[in-house]
Amino acid sequence: IRKVEKKIGFNISKKQKFIEYSPQAVKYLEIIAQKIKSNDGGILIIDYGYWEEKMKNTLKSISNHRFNDVLKNFTKADITYDINFRLLENILKNSGLKINGKNNQKIFLENLGINKRAEIISKNLPFLKKVDIFYRLKKLTDKKMMGEVFKVVFATNKNINFQAGFINWLNLENFLNLNP
């Protein structure tokens, strides 16, 4: 366990009942981080997952947009797991990157102005097309759909400071306390 802890930069409790991580994913993430460091780049990761300290079993099987038994349908289904964003954050930091921002998808997209964008593009559309746009918007941002299930993390080289999506630019004056 100590070897795994050192590799992933994550303390595994003795009470931990489940250890879920992909050595191959860690390896690829470290390679990507080194490329970012040497080229002054960044990485934006958006996926479903969780921020908790404790690892948990999130292995699941999905077929025809429905969850099913991993062992009963594995040849005809997508097998996946939730990303442990706390672990991901530790790997990125241990690779020398700076975490510039982290949020759930709802806040991230709203900070980028997705609601205003939906209003603008739907302004002159027929009613049914407007309904479709706002249904899709709800799916992306509603906390019961993708809004809180999906997480966003942005990591860059130490000398880059980019905050789009992580600061509410529409209310920047309030953020900076410019309005008394």
PLM features: residue spans?
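Long, Lys/Arg- and hydrophobic-enriched amphipathic alpha-helices
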Residues: 3-180
